[in-house]
Amino acid sequence: MSMYEEGLKLLEEKFGNGKDNVIALATIAQEPSADGGGPQPVVRDVNAYYENGVFYSVTYAKSCKMQQIAKNPAVSIAVCFEWFTAIGTGENLGWVLDPKNAELRNKLRTVFAEWYDKANNEEDENCCILAIRLTKGTLNINHWEKLYHMDFVNKTTMENGGVF
């Protein structure tokens, strides 16, 4: 098994299998920074479901994060307290009740069952699914004992390091 495949297996064990993960999601603000410089990063915690290199979250299409992703889909994530950081692309998959989202919606409702109905109004067409498609990431095992630098696009290990 390659380092990349080993890393994927560990990601599935840690974050997959129907787990509700809390991740820090960073996007790029639409407005310039307070000092007049370029756009600045904005970070918030979201609940996310992991499957095959993608984290999924249910959110509101008119939220700041979704507006930011619409203008610049580059995102960065960290799984809280799990030593996994990654960069990727955010994508609005549309309304949760769109028939194309039925299978994924059922998974999300199951994973987030404890709080899903309290936090989401599915009748509102702005209740949407955010897909965070990972492009590169680093999984840190036992405080730097072993690092998995993964390139999800090319499905390989990055030999010269990764995302810290």
Residue ranges and their predicted role:
Residues 85, 89-164:
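Charged, gly/pro-rich active-site loop segments
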Residues 18-25, 110-115:
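Short Pro/Gly-enriched beta-strand edge/turn motifs at strand-loop
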Residues 1-22, 157-159, 164:
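Extreme N-terminal tail/first-helix region
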Residues 20-61, 67-69, 75-79, 86-89:
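Short beta-strand segments
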Residues 52, 81, 134-136:
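Residue-level signal for tight coil/turn positions that link beta-strands
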Residues 16-20, 29-41, 93-104, 137:
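Intrinsically disordered, low-complexity coil segments
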Residues 10-16, 63-68, 128:
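Short linear motifs in intrinsically disordered
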